[in-house]
Structure formats: structure tokens, C-alpha cells
Amino acid sequence: MTEFIPPGTRFHALPSPFPFKRGGALHGARVAYETWGTLAADASNAILIVTGLSPDAHAAANDANPAAGWWEGMVGPGKAIDTDRWFVVCVNSLGSCRGSTGPASLNPATGQPYRLDFPELSIEDGARAAIEVVRAQGIEQLACVVGNSMGGMTALAVLMLHPGIARSHVNISGSAQALPFSIAIRSLQREAIRLDPRWNGGHYDDDAYPESGMRMARKLGVITYRSALEWDGRFGRVRLDSDQTDDDPFGLEFQVESYLEGHARRFVRFFDPNCYLYLSRSMDWFDLAEYADGDVLAGLAKIRVEKALAIGANTDILFPVQQQQQVADGLRAGGADARFIGLESPQGHDAFLVDFERFCPAVRGFLDAL
């Protein structure tokens, strides 16, 4: 089992023990993070970024690691999240294999990876861990907490669990609860991993690794991350050249199949399967309705921020724009000046990672007005 930690990653030690919402605790755990910009003397210019399932804390290039980050188009000097103005902290989720303690990390009690002995992970656990990092920077209140995809859930959990922790919130392609369609897709992804004989109840290694299960899980994910509209225009029904196919009668034939295969093969050995299972399930479990007798809008209305922006792509099938509209409506009911923007982007759920032409102006406009 392997962890994948970018150069320049910083670490914060969590309180020990660190209890989990659903029971159990970690001892000697840590959270990975990176920072950009300069914290103001009164610590009033801090922004927290909480991420989706797979990203590390390296959202953008910085002095510690000049390599481009996963959100390079959004974060940096003069960009939408302007590090000349803001002090930005990006936290890798608890339960990940990219620096924060997760199932692939060594259990200090045994000297072996936690594997399935890792406590049942919830979005709220990741939110509490992120705030430990924020407090360690000397920040009592954030100017804004920004979350995308799973991070949109984490950001809402941060705001629910820590009243007054932020003056504003940007929710990008996120939600206050998992929808049945999303739960169904993620359940199939987890099943593909668990049915691979090499998963072996979580006891795999580099030589006996559930590669087939991870490939299928990733392909299913990529299908939900993009959109049919994009693929119609990008691939159509174009077939592969003869030198790109093999003798398998049911092998790859269309360009879109090759695209999925390439994405899957690039991912399978760079994300730990058990971490994937834990983080995926945490999204299915998350539901702000738990905080308001089963009413998700009432749960959102309990959150107190001054301003909020909820934004998404109209082609997103995993976190559809109705969920961002719901976030804005619920926060507005709680007294926030909340705005919803649905963008006409063809790139589905992943649009926030690639369609900077549409997403950056909305985020910049909101933050510039703070």
C-alpha cells in the first residue's frame, strides 16, 4: 500500500486521540496542507479550500513546489482566488492517500497499514480535521471557505460544525446531501473494487493489486464526471485506427473507449483502493438533513454566513445544478446574501477543473466584492 505525497506538502498533527463521528479514533494522525500568499496581521484575509475525492493539497504552484497544481487556473497571483490578496490554505482530506492519515497509512498500534481497521470515515471528520489546520495558522475566522465536489460537502460541514468560522462560502459543484443516482454510481464503483479477487478484503500489495477493479471504478467515475454533450462533440462515433486495436474481438474499437481506458490506467496505481472506498462512502453518508429532523433546507438554514455563492454546470449529472440551487436557497433562508449561478458548460461535473473561462469570472466577482 502506497501514499502519494507531492513535494512541498506540509503536515499538521491532529489531537490524539482524534475521535470520529461514527465511533473509533485515530492516534498520532496528521493532515496534509499547503498555503499561498501572506496572512494579514489581523488574520482577516484567509481562505480555506477543501477538495474533491482524489486531489492532494497542491492546488497551485508555490515556492515549496513550483509544479502546476490541480486548480492552477483558479488559484494564484492575479487569478480568481488571488493570492496577492488572500492567504489560501488547501487541505487534503482526512482518509486520503495523498498526505493526510488514511487507510493506507501506518497504524502506530501495529506498524502495519490501517487497511479496513481505519475508523468509519464521515465528511464531518474531514471538516473537523481541516479546521484544526486553520486554527494552527492563528486564524479564528475565515474570510471564505471554498469547496468543490466532495469539498462542497466538507465546506458545508465546516460551517455547520463551527458556527461563525467563516464570513462567506463558495460552493462549487457541491451539495448538501448525496442523491440516489450518485449513491448508486458510487456503490457500483466500490463493488467493482471489492469484487476484484486481488482486493482480498483490503489486504493487497503492489504485487497483488486490484487493478481491474480500480480500472472499472475509474471508468464509471469518468463517465459521470463529464457529459454526453461533450463526448458527442469530442468523439462522435469515430473509431480507432487499425494500429490502435488488438486481436480481442471485444476489445477497444471507438475513440471514447480508448479515452476511458487511458484515464483509468493513469489513475489506478496513483490512488489507494481502500482510501477510495472510504472517501466514496463518506459522500453517500453525508446529509445536512440530519441536523434538522430530516429537512435538508432547514439544515442549510442553520448555517450562518454573511454571503454565499453556489455555482455549477448545467451538464453535471453527479452533482446536478439543482443541488447548488438548493444550497443557495437554504443559506438564503438562514439569512445569507446567497446567489446561485448555473453555467452553460459542456464539461459536466469536471467543468470546475477545466472550464476556467466560465468558472473564474463568477468566483472572482464574488471574492472581489468581499
Curated annotation (Swiss-Prot):
Q: Where in the cell is it found?
A: Cytoplasm
What does the entry list under GO cellular component? cytoplasm
Q: What is the protein's major site of localization?
A: cytoplasm
Superkingdom of the organism of origin: Bacteria
Q: How does it assemble?
A: Homodimer.
Q: Which family does it belong to?
A: Belongs to the AB hydrolase superfamily. MetX family.
Name of the protein: Serine O-succinyltransferase
Q: Taxonomy-wise, where does this protein's organism fall, top ranks first?
A: Bacteria, Pseudomonadati, Pseudomonadota, Gammaproteobacteria, Lysobacterales
